[in-house]
Curated annotation (Swiss-Prot):
<keyword id="KW-0694">RNA-binding</keyword>
<comment type="function">
    <text>Binds the poly(A) tail of mRNA. Appears to be an important mediator of the multiple roles of the poly(A) tail in mRNA biogenesis, stability and translation. In the nucleus, involved in both mRNA cleavage and polyadenylation. Is also required for efficient mRNA export to the cytoplasm. Acts in concert with a poly(A)-specific nuclease (PAN) to affect poly(A) tail shortening, which may occur concomitantly with either nucleocytoplasmic mRNA transport or translational initiation.</text>
</comment>
<dbReference type="InterPro" id="IPR045305">
    <property type="entry name" value="RRM2_I_PABPs"/>
</dbReference>
<feature type="compositionally biased region" description="Low complexity">
    <location>
        <begin position="630"/>
        <end position="641"/>
    </location>
</feature>
<comment type="similarity">
    <text>Belongs to the polyadenylate-binding protein type-1 family.</text>
</comment>
<dbReference type="InterPro" id="IPR000504">
    <property type="entry name" value="RRM_dom"/>
</dbReference>
<dbReference type="GO" id="GO:0006417">
    <property type="term" value="P:regulation of translation"/>
</dbReference>
<dbReference type="InterPro" id="IPR012677">
    <property type="entry name" value="Nucleotide-bd_a/b_plait_sf"/>
</dbReference>
<feature type="compositionally biased region" description="Acidic residues">
    <location>
        <begin position="407"/>
        <end position="416"/>
    </location>
</feature>
<dbReference type="InterPro" id="IPR034364">
    <property type="entry name" value="PABP_RRM1"/>
</dbReference>
<dbReference type="InterPro" id="IPR003954">
    <property type="entry name" value="RRM_dom_euk"/>
</dbReference>
<feature type="region of interest" description="Disordered">
    <location>
        <begin position="596"/>
        <end position="671"/>
    </location>
</feature>
<dbReference type="InterPro" id="IPR002004">
    <property type="entry name" value="PABP_HYD_C"/>
</dbReference>
<keyword id="KW-0539">Nucleus</keyword>
<keyword id="KW-0813">Transport</keyword>
<keyword id="KW-0677">Repeat</keyword>
<dbReference type="Pfam" id="PF00658">
    <property type="entry name" value="MLLE"/>
</dbReference>
Amino acid sequence: MAAPVAPGAVDQLAADLGNTSLGGGDNRAAPAINTNVAPGEYQTADPDTAGPTPSSAAPHPQSSASLYVGELDPSVTEAMLFELFSQIGSVASIRVCRDTITRRSLGYAYVNYNSTSDGEKALEELNYTLIKGRPCRIMWSQRDPALRKTGQGNVFIKNLDVAIDNKALHDTFAAFGNILSCKVAQDENGNSKGYGFVHYETDEAAAQAIKHVNNMLLNEKKVYVGYHIPKKDRQSKFEEMKANFTNIYVKNISLEATDEEFRDLFAKYGDVTSSSLARDSEGKSRGFGFVNFTTHECAAKAVEELNGKEFRGQDLYVGRAQKKHEREEELRKSYEAARLEKANKYQGVNLYIKNLADDIDDDKLRQMFSEYGPITSAKVMRDAVTEGSAEEETEGKDKENKKEGEQAAEAEGEAEGAEKKTEKKGDRRLGKSKGFGFVCFSNPDDATKAVAEMNQRMIEGKPLYVALAQRKDVRKNQLEASIQARNQLRMQQAAAQAGLPQQYMQTPVYYAPGQQPNFMPPGGRGMPFPQGGLGMPAVQGGRPGQFPPYAQQGGRGGMPPQQLPIYPLGQFPPGAYPQPNNPQFLAAIQQVQQQAAALGNGRGGPGGPGGRGMQGMPVPQGMPGGPGMAGFPPNGRPQNGNMGGRGGPGRGGNFAAGRGAPPAGPLAAGGELNASSLLQSQLTATNNPQQQKQILGENLFPKIQALQPDLAGKITGMLLEMDNAELVNLLEDEAALVAKVNEAMAVYDEYVKSQQGPGQGPAPTQGEAEAEKPKEEKAEEKA
């Protein structure tokens, strides 16, 4: 620590600082450092004013030579810092801290030297060096957060002149002891906020600085120096300060009012310590001011009696003076409350309409929905019109040509021409329609009725999409949840079609870094799939929320549970089952399906006469056709039924009757597992009606698409309104399905004709509908 400084020397230093400008432009400005020059050029001629004093560069009791370098420009790289700091000594490493996502610099770095002496020299010579036009701030790196956050030796200085920067503040307070860090608070533009912090190594140095610099003049401004109070301690006293305020804020003051009149207005309520009217750079009043009383009672009485009182023809506002951050917080809360109130006000009455034709404007949109109830507003969203476009210039020339011809016309003709010009001018101000808009009703019931009747209605050959308007964040969350659920269902259906065990249809398991999922070996002799429960990867450790390793279900050739080997991710033993998204696994499934398609179902399939498992392997216990097989794996859920044929799936998804197949389970008469029983097993596997409809829709759509490819989606949606039992019958009876599709087409054609209004023309043909599809898709993308 530095030796104590005599009070006379401190007073002399303060006097010098008070009579000297600390801004840039004099010998106090930090020199711009060229990283190609010698280290000696970093030092200035006057060590007392241009750089840190010897006390601040004294050997620091650090076990490592790690320096913190702050206030860096975002474009500063490790190479730039190495070029600068390597001139002091051997640099072990340099790291610029960056954002983990954007990789943008956070404005600070760490420089590690091989020796502590090099770190001390760099702290003394390179502190406040200009790097990319900004003075860097260097201090010892403190790895212990408890020591970094302690308030011991931390001094707060306020009412600083804007010309005082980090270096000038460091030079002022370095005479009292070793400074660990020194910083002047700045705004986003780099301008001083008028306060700063100095962190000393010891409390004694901080006490000396407070004693000798508090209430002294620095650049002709009296500064306040005191111990720094942590924010959490200030917040705890904030409510008490609010209840016992003495400073009041007054606005709506007449611009002709003087300071004396303003003070006399409040003097009769108690002893006024200070009063001030805010003025601009020209000395004119800004219409507000502040008054501070000695006691809270006087301030409260003034607020109570003067708030709303007339003064020089204007009603005053008198209230407790608030900090800027407090006022901003209140404004933020009031804005949020108003936004929520507005959202609740229009909840259930504001409709969102998309897939609008380009020629539909606000008036036509209002007319379309006016039959359902009173409308408060209707708006079609449009692109912004750019001024000076080529079209406007062309129209301007046409306007001039028309004007010459109108000079010889009669007064009525001129009036009509002026009206036409006004209409054209108004049309030019409207940009191109974005294809969507909003309609707000006054009654939620009217809005609900409009959604029910206008959604999917054909308007000018395009089906409208009408729904309740939602906030952007709510809509985004719903879309993400819907996409996730849809992907999950597709994974389950793909796994079922590929003949995967039930475990592969579950939600993927997240594995923490450093943890590897493991795979169990097959449970039966020659078994191509793991038996019940073995397909799910197991996680080592058994922490909460993770799946434990599944026990083996036994079977011929299977090993006891304690002898099961554990295989790391990506390495599978012969016959083990990889994850469904593995490219090798998908290729194997495709190969098996091709082989099955070539061989066909029936003879040679699992369970058939002479039937064998995949790759010529014998059928294990628990597989279709094997001993004890009832069509279900040990987990109780049915396997996919399209596994006929030798070694793989067969056409039609039917099994040939096998010697080892008992008559139990979902086997149909004659021992064949047909598509109906498979569909029934899928429907009974879930109790969710929405998922059942989804399964039926997935089975209906390809059949309907073969009959009506253009309207397959709409017809499928119409048929899904039927009961599930009727839908299953349609899937089994091809003739009934064709009849029902024809009936749905007739109903749809009749509906389209009934909705056609005058002037809208006939329903679009198939070619027109196909040509209209790209426009609809673009409109949906824009929406």
